[in-house]
Amino acid sequence: MRTIDDLGELRGKTVLVRSDFNVPLDGTTITDDGRIRAALPTLKRLVDAGAKVVVTAHLGRPKGAPDPAFSLAPVAQRLGALLGTPVALAADVVGPSAHETVAALSDGDVALLENVRFDPRESSKDDAERLELARAFAELADAFVSDGFGVVHRKQASVYDVATLLPHAAGDLVLAEVTALRKATDDPERPYAVVLGGSKVSDKLGVIANLLTKADTLLIGGGMVFTFLAAQGHQVGKSLLEEDQIDTVKGYLDQAEQSGVTIVLPTDIVAAEAFAADAPHQVVAADAIPADSIGLDIGPESGEAFAAVIRGAKTVVWNGPMGVFEFDAFAAGTRAVAQGLTDATAAGAFTIVGGGDSAAAVRSLGFDEAGFSHISTGGGASLEFLEGKTLPGLAVLED
C-alpha cells in the first residue's frame, strides 16, 4: 500500500484528503470528537510538509442535497481548534465556492469542503456518475490521501473513484488501522477472544461465520444475545429478537461445538419494564426473563465472567456494547468488558476496540484511550475487515 512518503515532495502541492468526520452531534455541538482527533497526525504531517490541504468528508445521511442540519461547519470549527489554525469551509462540494476556497490556500493551509453527501453522485450506484464527481475532485488537487478508515468499505467517489485519477496514498490513520486489524486477523497471539455486542445479529453474521474458523472464544452480549438465547430454547420476553435468524444462530452454535470454539453467553440479564433510563429493572437469570420485560444489559455475574475470559486472552477484539450504555442503569456490562480489556492490555495482550458505538462507549464511560492497544474509527469497515472481505477503498490503494 502506498504511503505519503511515496508521493514525494509536497510543498506547494494541493493534496485532497478523504477523512472520516462522521461525528455525533447534539444540534451543532459535537458530542464525541474522537474521529476528528484521529485524523490529526495525517493532516499535521501534510501541513508540516508545506502542502495545501483540502479535506473532504461526510456527516450523517443527507439525501443527496444540501441540508443545514448536516453541514460540516461545526467540524471545521473543531478541526481548526485542534490544529491551532483556521480551517476554511467551502460552501459547496466541488462548485464555485470549493474552487475559490482552494485557490486562496497558501502552503500549509487547510480547507474543508462541504459535506460530500450533499452531492448525489458520491454514493451513486452508477459508475459514470461517481467518476464524474471524482473528476471534479481531481481538478482541485495534485494528489489524493485516503485517511477515512470508516468509509473504506464503500465504493464512493471520494473514497474509491478519485484514487483512480490522482497519485494516491494511504494516510497514517488508515495504515495504523490496517496494521492493527491484520495483527488480530492474520496471526493472532492466542488465546484469541472476540467480544461481540450491539443490537442486531444480522449485522454481524459474516463476522461470526469468519471468526468461527479463527477465534478461540466468542463472547456475545448486547441486543443480539437474545437471538442466541432464543436459539437455545429460552424465552426472552420483550427483548430485541430476530426470529428470522434463529436457525442461522443454531447453526453457529453447532459449528462452534464441532470446531472447538467456545461461545460464551451471559448467565444473567438486567431486565427492565421499558426502554427508558429510569425504567424499573432487576437482575434475572438469562433463562428466566419475565414475559413483560426487556433485556437492556448483561448482568453483573456475566460482566465478571466476560472480564475474566478477556483478562486471560492474548488477543482481544471487541465490537459492540453489551447493553444500553447511554443509560447509567444499563452501562455496567459494557464497563466490565472495557475494564477487562484495559486489564488485559496492561498484562501484555493486544486489544482492539472496533466500531463506532464501542469507541463512543469507552470514551463516555471515562476510560483512558491509552489503556487499549488500538481504538478503531471504523464501524462497518472494521466489521467487514474482520469478515475477510475485500474493501474497495483499500484495494484501490494497492494499485
UniProtKB/Swiss-Prot annotation:
Signal peptide (UniProt feature, chain positions): none
GO BP of this protein: gluconeogenesis; glycolytic process
PROSITE patterns linked: PGLYCERATE_KINASE
Catalytic activity: (2R)-3-phosphoglycerate + ATP = (2R)-3-phospho-glyceroyl phosphate + ADP
Superkingdom of origin: Bacteria
GO CC, alphabetical: cytosol
Matching HAMAP family: Phosphoglyc_kinase
Membership in a protein family: Belongs to the phosphoglycerate kinase family.
Record-given protein name: Phosphoglycerate kinase
Species for this entry: Beutenbergia cavernae (strain ATCC BAA-8 / DSM 12333 / CCUG 43141 / JCM 11478 / NBRC 16432 / NCIMB 13614 / HKI 0122)
